[in-house]
Amino acid sequence: MDNRIVVVAGPTASGKTRLGIELAQALGGEIVSADSMQIYRRMDLGTAKATKEERAAAVHHMLDVADPAESWSVARYVEEASRCCDDIIARGRLPIVVGGTGLYIDSLISGLDFADNTSDNTLRDKLGAEYDSLGGEATLARLAQFDPERAAKL
């Protein structure tokens, strides 16, 4: 990904979308959302997702790209957002990354490579089966053997 991008970051409902749109209009840019909840379709409440009017005022990317049941990760975000940014730059426009998910933003702008990152659910599946067979109390007692502080919080 080319390094020419603008980033607008901050908490939910702090005016990032409005500023991003103004920058896109003034600088010939397109918005790339960096919000871990706005990627999901039908997750509009509580996410301050850009409205139809705001989307009409500037091109938006990385909104409504996944179903809520879909597995999503920072690695996948970086892969798809990088592709968006590269495409925007190839068309002579400026990517404007707008959002509040710091991990997404940091990973995108630092160019982290997740190519060798694979998900292995073996341990998760094993522990889930253990929980199902032993029950919550026994599983908590086992956790206390390895991490008493964490077990005490549960």
Regions found by a protein language model. Name each.
Residues 1-154:
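Phosphate/pyrophosphate-binding catalytic cores of soluble transferases and nucleic-acid-acting enzymes
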